[in-house]
């Protein structure tokens, strides 16, 4: 515990892109028409160079030596003024390389959002209203609630009453046992409800960046192999197996996961690592609720439920992680077990808004995966859905740079989580867990509000 | 004429010419223009209506966007030919349904939403005020204060009282036929206003009694209101300062928006104004625009039905905003249960906005709408802007009349809550 009170804040600083990112817009001029226009204007304005060469762009796209003949495409923000002024000469469109970004799940806009969050450490703030699809599947079909007149108040980004984003990981007793009251807590507090999940791919530099970032942030990262680095060891959540138990006993981790589908290691891990929190790692399927209840009855401290990287579970008829999570959460609630175990959710949690929405659906905290690689400028070479064959290939990076990018990402997501919580009038992210009543579902609202409206024939 | 004058004149003329030429599609549909909500066709159709005062005749889509939900998946029942003569149709609505207080009627079920001085240029603000006067409707100051230049239009200007209290003075409340409390804004529900530092020029800072080039984040919520009783004190305060003023309460769309509405009614409000999550803004965190609070399409029936069930529906005016882009959106909102609508982004589109979303930046808008830059502001001449906004609303009124005529309705008030006239598309 710090000796004096300090409000939790993640210190961000710029970590610019190392690999060039595509220009969002492609601006071009029909050169012959441009030349003709310049001649025309030269006559019209009697060779007044300043007027003739004043350009229809306030962002400097035509500020280069060759003006519109060689526009500075990276400066274009798509405002379209050049097209408005000279529709017969200018064309602005989304660039092909921008449109190629991502895959069937990761939209170019989502990739750009993560790249910019990791680079600047600042919340994206823009003018004009929302531009996208009305609702959608999964997290896109969920709106969080707000409250018109409640505390905590908000006086600017940092001038608000304190909102806690801390969560506890570990098993909680159902009642106070006074004989054990002097023992250390069996849970660990993490200042943000986000950990780094196991990455599909990664070189040593990426692993080092993740370890360093986890250490700086006071969070954890899941990995099958122990890193050979000095930093980040305390933040590691190893995935234990039968053969590796002795290694773990030598250096007991604070939290350990095991593949609950492949082995029944809980008893062994719990007895050999009495100070560690033992989490069962499970793919989300139609029977996950039942299995979660069984494991919780057996005494596991937490469950890490994962979907594929596009957020679809592994049921015969896959559904979105938001739906599967709700089912598991509700079964645990019905079984009277929910408050005893920690639920970590991962897979398809790729944008800041997915964190509160996953928590509303029942998770205590989330694990992020492909987003980490995107923030570190990994390359999309195909579909990223399959955990075993994810086509997101890490590039060579400087671990210090990578760690700062990830710290920035967490800082921005933390601030955005606070925006959501403050709008809802919630002071503690722990109170958001499973609070479906503070969310609004597109499918439900549509049926309620459009009730009685006939279908078009 | 100095070079600066010539440069402003040159670009101003070019932009205005472009707005005339683009909708005829001679140069095709600009590829980079628009998005799912405001499609390129919808933007160009709005330019066309603002130019001609009539509906587009070249096939441009002017009724819906392409967002895949809400208004965009609602249509009208096939109603055959017109059953009422268009010119006999009454589009007016009352803004005060209570027995006491001044009666105000507007000839169209539309008035202009809050856009603050600082977030938009003074010239655009003047264009809106002039248009409101000509149409005998209203526009709202937004929360950035009440510039002296709009005082001549005060009979058509709504004074907004928001959490920052910028420019809220006794005289600005006394000017106002309607005072609007902004509890929340659809684009950033629960977060208060944002005006980023670059746009806080000396004039803006003076108006808001703040420091130049310092970001201004309005508080949230009103620190004097934590209950309906507190809210009633607010309403009483306005009615004491200006007993003639109607009170509008602008709120966002939380899950209990129906309770908020009934609370406002009991506090004495004349208008409950619900601003859905897909509304416009000069600057807002992107996370707030998509994810917080429900779209207005879902909130309108919820509020309308609840006010009906409480037996007070005919004593309070329900105004909807937040994503109202077209005349069809207005008619659909009314059919869902609203009395009328507030629009703001559409007015900006009418004078050349491309919905590019760069309003928050340093110099702000490239065509002089959402800017405090003195040079860029001059692209919007108030008279020119007024004409375009009036034209847009004139074209919309033609479309509204055509919808009503098809259903044999002589009064827009008879459309309210007529969900049976709508159809849903998958």
Language-model-derived ranges and their functions:
Chain B
Residues 352-419, 423-424:
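Active-site or pore-adjacent capping/gating segments
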Residues 122, 126, 225-232, 293-297, ...:
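Electropositive phosphate-/nucleotide-binding environments in soluble metabolic enzymes
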Residues 180-228, 240, 255:
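Active-site cores of enzymes that catalyze phosphoryl transfer or operate on phosphate-rich substrates
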Residues 127-138, 234-241, 263-267, 302-306, ...:
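Generic, well-ordered alpha-helical scaffold segments in large soluble proteins
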Residues 78, 97-99, 108-110, 119, ...:
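Solvent-exposed, flexible loop/coil residues
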Residues 135-139, 164-167, 182-186, 204-209, ...:
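Glycine-rich loops and low-complexity Gly/Arg-rich segments
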Residues 1-110, 114-203, 387, 397, ...:
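Conserved, well-structured core domains of diverse proteins
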């Amino acid at each position: 515990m710090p000796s004096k009170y300090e409000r939790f804040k993640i210190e961000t600083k710029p970590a610019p892109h190392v690999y060039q990112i595509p220009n969002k817009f492609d601006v071009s001029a029909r050169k012959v028409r441009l030349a003709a226009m310049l001649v025309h204007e030269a006559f019209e304005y009697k060779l007044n160079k300043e007027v003739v060469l004043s350009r229809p762009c306030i962002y400097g796209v035509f500020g280069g030596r060759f003006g519109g003949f060689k526009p500075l495409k990276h400066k274009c923000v798509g405002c379209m003024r050049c097209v408005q002024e000279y529709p017969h000469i200018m064309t602005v469109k989304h660039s092909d390389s921008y449109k190629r970004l991502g895959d069937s799940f990761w939209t170019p806009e989502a990739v750009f959002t993560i790249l910019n969050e990791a680079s600047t450490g600042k919340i994206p703030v823009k003018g004009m209203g929302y531009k996208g699809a009305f609702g959608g599947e999964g997290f896109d079909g969920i709106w969080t609630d707000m409250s018109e007149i409640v505390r905590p108040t908000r006086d600017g980004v940092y001038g608000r009453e304190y909102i806690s984003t801390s969560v506890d990981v570990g098993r909680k007793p159902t009642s106070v046992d006074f004989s054990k009251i002097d023992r250390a807590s069996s849970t660990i507090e993490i200042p943000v409800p986000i950990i780094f999940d196991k990455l599909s791919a990664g070189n040593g530099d990426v692993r080092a960046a993740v370890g360093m970032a986890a250490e700086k942030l006071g969070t954890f990262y899941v990995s099958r192999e122990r890193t050979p680095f000095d930093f980040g060891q305390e933040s590691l959540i190893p995935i234990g197996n039968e053969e590796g138990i002795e290694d773990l006993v030598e250096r007991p981790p604070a939290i350990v996961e095991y593949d609950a589908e492949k082995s029944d290691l809980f008893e062994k891990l719990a007895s050999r690592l009495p100070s560690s929190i033992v989490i069962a790692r499970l793919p989300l399927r139609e029977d996950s609720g039942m299995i979660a209840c069984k494991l919780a009855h057996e005494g596991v401290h937490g469950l890490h439920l994962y979907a594929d990287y596009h957020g679809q579970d592994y049921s015969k008829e896959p559904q979105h992680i938001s739906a599967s999570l709700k089912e598991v959460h509700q079964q645990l609630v019905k079984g009277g077990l929910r408050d005893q175990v920690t639920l970590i959710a991962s897979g398809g949690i790729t944008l800041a808004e997915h964190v509160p929405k996953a928590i509303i659906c029942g998770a205590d905290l989330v694990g992020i995966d492909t987003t980490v690689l995107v923030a570190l400028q990994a390359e999309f070479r195909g579909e990223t859905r399959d955990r075993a064959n994810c086509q997101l290939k890490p590039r060579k990076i400087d671990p210090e740079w990578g760690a700062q990018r990830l710290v920035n990402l967490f800082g921005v997501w933390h601030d955005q989580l606070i925006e959501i919580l403050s709008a809802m009038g919630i002071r503690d992210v722990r109170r958001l867990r499973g609070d479906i009543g503070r969310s609004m579902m597109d499918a439900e609202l549509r049926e309620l509000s459009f009730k009685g409206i006939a279908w078009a024939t | 004429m100095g070079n600066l004058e010539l440069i402003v004149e040159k670009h101003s003329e070019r932009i205005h010419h472009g707005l005339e030429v683009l909708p005829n599609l001679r140069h095709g549909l600009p590829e980079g223009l628009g998005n799912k909500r405001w499609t390129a066709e919808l933007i160009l159709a709005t330019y066309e209506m603002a130019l001609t005062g009539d509906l587009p005749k070249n096939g441009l889509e002017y009724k819906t966007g392409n967002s895949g939900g809400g208004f965009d998946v609602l249509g009208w029942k096939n109603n055959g030919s017109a059953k009422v003569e268009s010119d006999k149709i009454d589009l007016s609505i009352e803004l005060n349904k209570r027995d006491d207080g001044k009666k105000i009627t507007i000839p169209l079920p539309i008035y202009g939403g809050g856009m603050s001085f600082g977030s938009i240029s003074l010239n655009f603000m003047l264009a809106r005020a002039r248009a409101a006067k000509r149409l005998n409707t209203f526009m709202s100051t937004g929360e950035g204060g009440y510039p002296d230049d709009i005082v001549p239009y005060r009979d058509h200007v709504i004074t907004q009282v928001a959490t920052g209290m910028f420019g809220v003075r006794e005289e600005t409340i006394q000017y106002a036929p309607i005072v609007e409390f902004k509890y929340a804004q659809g684009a950033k529900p629960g977060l208060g206003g944002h005006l980023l530092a670059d746009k806080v020029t000396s004039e803006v800072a003076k108006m808001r009694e703040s420091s130049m080039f310092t970001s201004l984040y309005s508080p949230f919520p009103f620190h004097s209101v934590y209950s309906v009783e507190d809210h009633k004190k607010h309403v009483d305060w306005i009615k004491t300062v200006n007993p003639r003023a109607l009170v509008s309460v602008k709120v966002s769309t939380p899950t209990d928006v129906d309770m908020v509405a009934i609370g406002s009614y009991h506090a004495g409000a004349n208008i409950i104004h619900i601003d859905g999550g897909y509304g416009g803004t000069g600057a807002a965190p992107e996370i707030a625009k998509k994810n917080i609070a429900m779209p207005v399409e879902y909130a309108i029936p919820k509020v309308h039905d609840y006010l009906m069930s409480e037996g007070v529906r005919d004593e309070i005016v329900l105004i909807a905003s937040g994503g109202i882009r077209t005349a069809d959106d207005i008619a659909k909102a009314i059919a869902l249960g609203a009395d009328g609508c507030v629009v703001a982004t559409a007015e900006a589109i009418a004078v050349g906005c491309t919905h590019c979303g760069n309003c928050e930046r340093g110099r702000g808008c490239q065509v002089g709408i959402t800017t405090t830059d003195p040079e860029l502001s001059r692209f919007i001449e108030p008279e020119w802007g007024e004409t375009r906004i009036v034209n847009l609303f004139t074209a919309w009124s033609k479309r509204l009349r055509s919808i009503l005529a098809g259903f044999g309705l002589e009064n827009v008030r008879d459309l309210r809550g007529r969900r049976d006239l709508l159809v849903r598309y998958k």
